[in-house]
Every structure is written in structure tokens, then in C-alpha cells.
């Protein structure tokens, strides 16, 4: 899941796939498509036969625009939104001050987690701008009521609540290195993508780390400009 697409069927919230999997590209063309839960099971089984474990990622609290386009009530502003069709980071994220947001995410996780028998579940946690939270009365009330210092600690609060759901289902949580900000969730494995520093910091606190610095391991570019 991301700002650009939601690509898995959630039976309790059908608009996630119906709306979140359809994007109008910058050139006017339409990109669409999602996996049904049965298709996910087929992919997981195919991978397992080849000794590959598929690890799902449901991005939160940021990179959530596809979900918020389908269900804008879980944002800070109420929308309306459109799926992002260009590079960049989206300011609109899940509202951390709304308890209904956590109910929504728990329902989603309880459908997704059983589809993936592996040990790990990735929650993203990266690139979550705080501009909406800083302006949102509900989020500011949450910060006050939970005795949090700022929006960075609010993100940590958010991740901790999600971690409890994941642990209750017998999974271990993975998140990008931004989950270090405001205090790291106790069981988290950190994927350090912005460099090596986050991984070193997490390891020094006794956490498992996966080093994925963007300069070396994000294989999304051609080998040379000529290609």
C-alpha cells in the first residue's frame, strides 16, 4: 500500500481496492489492478515452494493517500483526495487523534496478517510529514492527553499502538528508520534506508537491523544514464 495505489482486497472495506487501486497517470492514462485475497494466497504459496518468504507492508501513518482517497474520514481534514501520480511525499496522513483510525487499521491488519504465514509484518513508518498533525485539533488533543512532547512522539505513540496489534497475532514488526523518532517500539526490527546511522542507532539499543541504505540497495534505477 502507498500514496499511489492500494493493491490488496480488504473485504470489510471494499472501497480500498475499488477506489484505491485506480490511478489516473500524469499522461491521462488509467492504471488499475489489485490482488484478491485468494490471489495473495497463490503468490505466497508459489514463493514458499521456492524458499521465498513474502513479507507484506501496509504503510502507516504516512504514505496512506490511496486509503484516504477511499475513506477520507480517517484523515485529519476529511478530504476529498486523489491518488498521487507523481514522485514526492504526501502531507495527508492517517489522523492519529481519531480512535476510529486505529479501529480501521486493526480491521485491515486482521484481514491481511493471516494471508502471510511468515514471521514478519512491515508497517512502513517512513516519510510521515507532521504538518496535518500540527494543525489537527484531535491530534493536538492526543498529544496533550498522552503527555507527549510533540508530533514526533505522536508518531511513536501511533506505531506503539499498531505494534500491539501485530504482536497479538504472533508477528514481529519491521519499520523504516523513521520509527526511531520519538522512541522506538520495543519489538521493532529497523530497516535503515536513509543511510547507515539509523541502523547503527537501533543496533546500539539492542534491536535487529536490516541495512538498506538507499544509495546502494534501492534497485530502481538503470545501471548507467545510457540505459
Regions found by a protein language model. Give the residues of each.
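Conserved small/polar residues in nucleotide/adenosyl-binding loops
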Residues: 217-224
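Active-site-proximal beta-strand/loop segments in catalytic clefts of secreted hydrolases
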Residues: 59, 125-126, 177-179, 193, ...
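Short, intrinsically disordered, charge-balanced linker/junction segments flanking boundaries
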Residues: 209, 226-227
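Substrate-binding cleft/loops of secretory-pathway carbohydrate-active enzymes
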Residues: 178-205, 219
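Hydrophobic faces of well-ordered beta-strands that scaffold small-molecule active sites
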Residues: 56, 121, 173-175, 190-191, ...
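Generic recognition of flexible, low-complexity loop/linker segments
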Residues: 110-112, 162-163, 177-179, 197-199
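Acidic, contiguous N-terminal accessory segments
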Residues: 165-180, 184
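Substrate-binding cleft of carbohydrate-active enzyme catalytic domains
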Residues: 1-169
Amino acid at each position: 500500500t502507498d500514496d499511489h495505489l492500494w493493491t490488496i482486497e480488504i473485504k470489510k472495506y471494499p472501497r480500498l481496492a475499488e477506489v484505491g487501486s485506480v490511478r489516473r497517470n500524469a499522461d491521462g492514462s488509467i492504471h488499475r489492478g489489485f490482488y484478491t485475497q485468494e490471489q495473495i494466497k497463490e503468490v505466497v504459496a508459489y514463493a514458499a515452494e521456492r524458499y521465498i518468504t513474502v513479507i507484506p507492508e501496509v504503510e502507516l501513518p504516512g504514505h496512506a493517500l490511496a486509503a484516504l482517497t477511499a475513506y477520507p474520514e480517517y484523515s485529519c481534514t476529511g478530504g476529498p483526495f486523489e491518488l498521487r501520480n507523481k514522485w514526492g511525499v504526501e502531507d495527508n496522513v492517517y489522523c492519529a487523534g481519531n480512535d476510529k483510525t486505529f479501529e480501521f487499521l486493526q480491521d485491515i491488519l486482521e484481514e491481511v496478517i493471516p494471508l502471510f504465514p511468515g514471521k514478519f509484518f512491515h508497517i512502513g513508518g517512513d516519510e510521515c510529514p507532521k504538518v496535518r498533525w500540527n494543525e489537527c485539533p484531535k491530534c493536538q488533543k492526543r498529544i496533550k492527553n498522552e503527555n507527549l512532547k510533540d508530533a514526533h512522539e505522536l508518531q511513536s505513540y501511533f506505531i506503539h499502538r499498531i505494534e500491539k496489534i501485530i504482536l497479538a497475532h504472533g508477528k514481529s514488526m519491521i519499520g523504516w528508520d523513521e520509527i526511531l523518532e520519538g522512541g522506538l517500539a520495543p519489538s521493532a526490527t529497523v530497516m535503515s534506508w536513509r543511510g547507515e546511522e539509523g541502523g547503527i542507532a537501533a543496533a546500539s539499543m539492542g534491536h535487529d537491523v536490516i541495512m538498506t541504505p538507499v544509495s546502494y540497495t534501492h534497485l530502481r534505477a538503470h545501471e548507467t544514464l545510457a540505459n
